[in-house]
Design a protein with these regions (language model features):
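Hydrophobic helical h-region of N-terminal Sec-dependent signal peptides
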Residues: 14-18
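A beta-rich soluble binding module of mature secreted/lumenal proteins
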Residues: 5, 10, 20-185
Length: 185
């Protein structure tokens, strides 16, 4: 049985999240980083694990963070984010939609608290849809996501180089699983 945060607490987290992401979005260099093209939303669906993130107040002390994306018949996406906090699995649900319906651009709008939406921009996606980098409207938000709970040091280094090139504060990244597998190069 899942333990859930009280609804009003989830709504508070979502409202803060949306306000922060939209606060200075139009002036952010993150808007200059293009989303991936030739994006296949069906292939993106399923479970993703959070490998790294910039710190923010709605995921404080959250570990084992993961997201499950489920495409609906109307083209919207059901989002279920979950993670461990104080040894309890918590979850937050949202709905997402394409910014440009029918396009192959990796850019979605996500609402944890209707009618407010925030940007979910996929700025890197490997060809097998197993490793992704996602941002919002500002340089304060970025996530490295993987289909696997652990990634290789090479994969992490590649992501960090891209983030650094784009101007993200990689020294501030948090690694909520603490699991990074080293492999021979």
């Amino acid at each position: 049985m899942k333990n859930r945060l009280p609804r009003n607490l989830i709504n508070s987290f979502a409202a803060i999240y949306i306000l922060l992401l939209n606060g200075c979005g139009n002036f952010s260099p993150a808007n200059e980083i293009p989303p991936v093209k030739n994006f296949n939303i069906k292939q993106y669906m399923g479970k993703w694990y959070e490998i790294a993130r910039l710190p923010h107040n709605f995921e404080v002390d959250v570990t084992d963070a993961q997201a499950v994306y489920t495409l609906q018949d109307d083209g919207t996406v059901i989002v279920e984010n979950s993670g461990m906090k104080n040894h309890v699995r918590t979850s937050a649900h949202a709905i997402a939609r394409s910014v440009t319906p029918g396009s192959e651009i990796g850019e979605l709008e996500v609402s944890f608290f209707y009618p407010f939406y925030t940007m979910y921009k996929i700025i890197y996606l490997d060809k097998d849809y197993t490793l992704a980098i996602v941002t919002g409207n500002s340089m304060d938000y970025v996530w490295i996501l993987s289909r696997k709970k652990v990634i290789s040091k090479n994969e992490l280094d590649m992501c960090l180089k891209m983030l650094e090139k784009w101007g993200y504060a990689i020294k501030l990244l948090q690694y909520p699983t603490g699991e990074i597998m080293n492999i021979a190069q």
